[in-house]
Amino acid sequence: KTLVEDNQLEAVINLPSGVFKPYAGVATAILIFTKGGQTDEVWFYDLQNDGYSLDDKRNPIKDNDLPHLLASWKHYRTLRGLPVDNFMGEKLASLLKQQYPEGIDAGVDFKDRTQAAFIVPKEDIAAQKYDLSINRYKEVVYQAEEYEDPKVILKRLKDLEKEILADLDELEGML
């Protein structure tokens, strides 16, 4: 509550669970805030991949959301007319160009809570008793799964069972 009411909480960056393995496997987040000031809205980012595996070895992997995170943060601050530091090194800029050759969509307004980056008004955070867990605010979109008719699946299983029994009879005849 103090971070939101008595300071300017600017961002909550949700890190993947296990990012600090082998030391700790707990869920963590980075909070960006300015002492004093006031919070009007908070920018959330759900970081899925940090460029390393989430096991104890932490080997490099292809998926890396860090360039997108930094570019989105820069874009958000630019849209709000806030100062933007050039904090992206050559390596991250190169990764960003590889993953997003067209760049970050300039049409993004961060209101869509199904995306990796979105904003939450202070009022919504207060209504959630100042809980900064990203799962309180991010909307999950479920894909509808379509399955074949159960009768078709059952018939296919029966046919497979007949084939297996025939193969077992043939195998038994060889003994």
Show the residue positions of the predicted features.
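A conserved structural/catalytic subdomain of Rossmann-like adenosyl-cofactor enzymes
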Residues: 1-174
